[in-house]
Amino acid sequence: PDDLLAVVYHMIASQLGRVRFAAICRSWRAAAHCAPPVPALPLLLLSPRDCSGTKAHLHCPEDGAVVPLRLPRKAVIKCIVGCHDGGWVASSLPDPFRIVNLFSGAEVPLNKKQAIISCTSRYHGSGQVQILKVVFSGPPKSGECILAALTYNCGIALCRVGCPNTGWSVEGCPNKPIVDILFWNGELYSLLYDGHLIKFEIGMNEDGAPVITATHWLVIHRIGRHQRGILQGLC
């Protein structure tokens, strides 16, 4: 019965197991297709790869399985700085900046301005900016997807994939180092080295490129030294 198949499908822990379930026969594939999406941990791309850069292994944290992956020639990359559901990764090396799919080899078209982040700050000289991390506001194939890049010494840079005539907007060189950035429910957040959490409001300039229009410092509950020691003792 279809109801029983749906129950069994939801009991499968790993994404690999669900793929194998759907491959058994037509009725099982139909049951998997009709079932609501099951939350899953992301697959981990293991390093090192072979010298050619075309072979890799994926690790499934849910069941510990290691799956071999042959990368399409177009997807050969050396430095992954971000990812999105469906096998999409952002690569900063070799130049230029690219967004490719590890499974299909498809690539998101970017113009020359979007392929390189440049900063004109007088504090450390102009030139290409080193990217530490890139986060996506939505699917990279969407025309509304905004990219936020955490850079080495130029703060946050923003780019809209669906804007063919615009590039990256570098949002200043902060005095306090940024540790991490994240899109959550369409909002961009950053965590500073000193523990402060910031939420950014993003608008569009006259060219349609994304820019930060407001900054909100959020109130967070800090863990004191005494509480931190207790937590470390419990771990």
What are these regions (language model features)?
Residues P1-A23, S27:
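N-terminal Skp1-binding subsegment of the F-box domain
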Residues M11, I24, S47-R49, P61, ...:
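Acidic/polar N-terminal loop/beta-strand segments that form early-domain functional surfaces
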Residues Q15, V19, H33-T54, R73-G87:
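Beta-strand-rich domains and repeat architectures in extracellular enzymes and scaffolds
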Residues R73-C235:
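A sequence/structural signal of beta-propeller blade repeats
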